[in-house]
Amino acid sequence: MYQVIHTNKESKMVDNRMRFTIDRSMQFPLVEIDLEHGGSVYLQQGSMVYHTENVTLNTKLNGKGSGLGKLVGAIGRSMVSGESMFITQAMSDGDGKLALAPNTPGQIVALELGEKQYRLNDGAFLALDGSAQYKMERQNIGKALFGGQGGLFVMTTEGLGTLLANSFGSIKKITLDGGTMTIDNAHVVAWSRELDYDIHLENGFMQSIGTGEGVINTFRGHGEIYIQSLNLEQFAGTLKRYLPTSSN
């Protein structure tokens, strides 16, 4: 069942905060977003379940810039990190509704943007207020060279609004207060933008091959980290062992 976790229950409502509810009458509830006239929201491609007639969906190139440069950048990110070239923008010419569902079973965390900004790992993005902004940031190629789990780019938020991130499995929030935390990259959902982080192979390349451990993130400083309880790549590998092959 999908759940929404509010990260700051005491914070005041802001004008551009996303208004959304969870339909809990279903075994796997949907996120339903209320859009006012002229309102918009960015959403994960393929996450739309339904919308009212005054809501329109438009596909946009995923990234900043314009023209050929933006197209080349989107193609390049898609080739090297597996990230989608496109993002969907929903716009409303009146009061409307839009329902979304993540592509994996798990939880949804609502992150309020303003004083706090976040970075998202690959596959964690679900929706973002149209009043907020995001950019795709290139990671140090040495950090992500052997990744396959987070890619060479991460999404970084800017501005005011609400971000919805989704997980595979349950979400746990970790708060760092000047310390250090090492986390398997496949379990990282999102983290505070002000945190320093380093992506590398656990114990080096050969040791990682021998132990089966993959890419890890080491975070330092003050901020929040959201992790997921399940590893999508390991889950896919488990299922693969039971799938028939052409030789069977």
Curated annotation (Swiss-Prot):
Gene3D superfamilies cross-referenced by the UniProt entry: Mitochondrial biogenesis AIM24 (3.60.160.10)
Protein name (database record): Uncharacterized protein M6_Spy0233
